[in-house]
Regions:
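Intrinsically disordered, low-complexity terminal regions
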Residues: 1-314
Length: 314
């Protein structure tokens, strides 16, 4: 392992006043690193109080531009950007000075990486994470910041708190978790697991995955749309809000739906015993077959209604 050479010298902006920047941004230094890496190498990036943005490109090198900033010149200079690389990996970290754990400081990174590089550990706090056009797995984490990931050919694991999670065009499984933030997922080809609290989950899947889809929230609504008949099991659970499931007309499944202090309605005929047609459309429990039956769909809420709608809208 060797420490990467700084390609461009740090540009000091100390002493300048910026009307639109908070105290932690007052003193800044920019940095720029470039080095070669194998196409399937590994990327680790860690920061705090700042964003991380990563885009894949068709070059066998990594390019990093960024800015470190602080409320005083001394804190800015004490904040270190630690970068190491080999042909197989790149690691970059923003490191607080050991004597200062609470001062106003942080760093943001913008990175271009080989398209098939694995994003092994991308983490920040109080800032967003954005990933685009990567052809391998991505493990992303933030706190008090949103995560936005688009066009990834590999499994995605995205965790944050007090921020939203957006995932679009994922050619693999996606695990999306937050608290007090909404989750929106589109076009996930593998297993989808989404979990939040006090906010909504919306998922639109053009092609229903063969793996399980699991959506769990509390005090938030769930809206799931499938563009094709379900192939894998589906579980959606919330409290104090509604669930909407949009299915194509040719859907076939085993439906189990439960609510308390709400109602269940279905555009589909659900074959079950012991109820009249009207009772099957509006009730608090439904257990039966849609069409010839198939994967199990479990929908559960309290203090909210459940609606199974015909027509995907995709």
């Amino acid at each position: 392992m060797r420490t990467a050479l700084v390609v461009a010298a740090a540009i000091s902006l100390a002493g300048c006043e910026f009307g639109d920047l908070g105290p932690s941004d007052r003193y800044q230094s920019d940095f720029h690193y470039t080095f070669e890496m194998q196409p399937t190498g590994r990327i680790d990036a860690e920061s705090f109080n700042g964003s991380i943005e990563i885009s894949g490109w068709d070059q066998n090198k990594v390019e990093i531009t960024g800015t470190k900033y602080a409320s005083t010149e001394a804190l800015r200079d004490a904040l270190k950007i630690d970068v190491h690389n080999t042909p197989e990996m790149v690691e970059i970290r923003a490191v607080r000075p050991s004597y200062e754990r609470t001062g106003n400081m942080g760093a943001r990174f913008t990175m271009h990486v080989p398209r098939k590089a694995m994003l092994d550990r991308i983490t920040t706090s109080n800032g967003p994470v954005k990933v685009r056009d990567v052809g391998s797995a991505a493990h992303l984490k933030s706190s008090n910041g949103p995560i936005d990931v688009t066009n990834v050919s590999g499994d995605v694991d995205a965790h944050t708190s007090n921020g939203s999670v957006e995932a679009d065009t994922i050619r693999g499984a996606a695990t999306l978790k937050t608290s007090n933030g909404r989750i929106h997922a589109e076009d996930v080809s593998g297993a989808l697991e989404a979990e939040t609290s006090n906010n909504s989950i919306t998922a639109r899947l053009d092609t229903a995955p063969a793996a399980t889809t699991k959506l769990v929230t509390s005090n938030g609504s769930i809206d799931l749309t499938l563009g094709s008949a379900p192939k894998g099991d589906i579980r959606a659970e919330t409290r104090n809000n509604s669930i909407k499931l949009h299915l194509p007309a040719d859907a076939a499944a085993h439906l189990v739906a439960d609510t308390s202090n709400g109602s269940i309605s279905s555009d589909f005929s659900v074959a079950s015993r012991g109820d009249s047609d009207e009772e099957k459309k509006h009730r608090k429990h439904m257990d039966g077959l849609i069409g010839a039956g198939g994967p199990t769909i479990e929908l559960s809420t309290s203090n909210g209604s459940i609606h199974i709608l015909k027509g995907s809208g995709i």
